[in-house]
Amino acid sequence: MIRVNNVCKKYHTNSGWKTVLKNINFELQKGEKIGILGRNGAGKSTLIRLMSGVEPPTSGTIERSMSISWPLAFSGAFQGSLTGMDNLRFICRLYDVDPDYVTRFTKEFSELGDYLYEPVKKYSSGMKARLAFALSLSVEFDCYLIDEVIAVGDSRFAEKCKYELFEKRKDRSIILVSHSPSAMKSYCDNAVVLENGIMHHFEDMDKAYQYYNETQK
């Protein structure tokens, strides 16, 4: 289970402190799939970073009794001067996973070929996303964090990503952040809406859609 308790997040800006998340509360059970709807700037990606442990909350707590992925396709943690393979080996040490398996999986899944032996700073954004997604799926987690539905490379590769995540790992928990209600309907059991840093809960997904659509007017 993941429990988010009264979480707030503030950032210091040139004009003073900006509150991005305000008293966020929710729980995610094993196998549950929740969507987080919100327009750009609503705090969705910030919440994902907090849940993954990339950043701490300003106040409140996040309790984790199951393993949580880093945000899928997030390449910000890569060391640009290192090769794709060097970054892969670092992930293996960090998560104590078999480097031979991760190497085989990443080579086959990412389809990056010899670019795996080039510095990541030479990669295009799409290549970085392919590497990040392959590494994310090479390590098994109880809960996967997805910041926007798979938009990596061409449609064939995107479909391969969706199959690996939503079919082969359909027993896992998922938190899917998006501004696309259709994506939520395809992959989630229920949804919440983030609006100006405040989380709104609903009895079912249709009511969440309705509220979200009203906020877009």
From Swiss-Prot:
Keyword Cell inner membrane assigned: yes
Entry's localization field: Cell inner membrane
Any Gene Ontology CC annotation: plasma membrane
Topology in the lipid bilayer: Peripheral membrane protein
SUPFAM superfamilies the UniProt entry points to: P-loop containing nucleoside triphosphate hydrolases
Any one GO molecular-function label of the UniProt entry: ABC-type transporter activity
Lineage top rank: taxon: Bacteria
Chain ranges of the ABC transporter domain: 2-217
Chain sites annotated for binding ATP: G38, R39, N40, G41, A42, G43, K44, S45
Keyword Cell membrane on entry: yes
Chief location of this protein within or outside the cell: membrane
GO terms, biological process: polysaccharide transport
Coiled coil: none
Pfam families (UniProt xref): ABC_tran (PF00005)
Keywords for this protein: ATP-binding, Capsule biogenesis/degradation, Cell inner membrane, Cell membrane, Membrane, Nucleotide-binding, Polysaccharide transport, Sugar transport, Transport
Functional note: Putative ATP-binding protein, and an energy-coupling component of capsule polysaccharide export apparatus.
Homology family: Belongs to the ABC transporter superfamily.
Protein's recorded name: ATP-binding protein BexA
Organism: Haemophilus influenzae
